[in-house]
Amino acid sequence: MRTQSLLLLGALLAVGSQLPAVFGRKKGEKSGGCPPDDGPCLLSVPDQCVEDSQCPLTRKCCYRACFRQCVPRVSVKLGSCPEDQLHCLSPMNHLCHKDSDCSGKKRCCHSACGRDCRDPARG
């Protein structure tokens, strides 16, 4: 009986430790995503955080202009953006800034010429 209890406890601990990975997040990582980082790079500014747990409430630790800081998180839709194999010859033009700018299941994805709304990649 003791052996079975220890095996059950071990299995529960193993499964519990994998839950953040199952949901695509590291332990301590808050849900949601980071807003786009379009700012100029300010190399002399030190990081204000290293991980989400250092940020208050619903803020996430995100890169902003080449350093990390606590910013309001944005909602992220399911699926990943498709790969873009093109090279842009015109100036960048952003048609969206975050997933909630896009209708239905479409995601705001980086493309060769900026961000635009696209259907998530399959697979």
UniProtKB/Swiss-Prot annotation:
Instruction: Tell me the ranges covered by the WAP domain, including all copies.
Output: 27-74, 75-121
Its GO CC terms are: extracellular space
Q: Which UniProt keywords apply?
A: Disulfide bond, Protease inhibitor, Repeat, Secreted, Serine protease inhibitor, Signal
Q: Which Pfam families match?
A: WAP (PF00095)
Gene3D superfamilies assigned to the protein according to its UniProt record, in alphabetical order = Elafin-like
For this protein, the record's InterPro entries field holds: Elafin-like_sf, WAP_dom, WAP_four-disulfide_core
The signal peptide stretch is 1-24
Q: Which residues form each disulfide bond in the chain? A: 34-62, 41-66, 49-61, 55-70, 81-109, 88-113, 96-108, 102-117
One GO biological process term is: antibacterial humoral response
MF-aspect GO terms? serine-type endopeptidase inhibitor activity
Signal keyword on record: yes
Major localization class: secreted
Indicate where this protein resides in the cell.
Secreted
Instruction: State what this protein does.
Output: Putative acid-stable proteinase inhibitor.
List the protein's name. WAP four-disulfide core domain protein 5
Q: Which organism is it from?
A: Gorilla gorilla gorilla
What is the gene called?
Answer: WFDC5
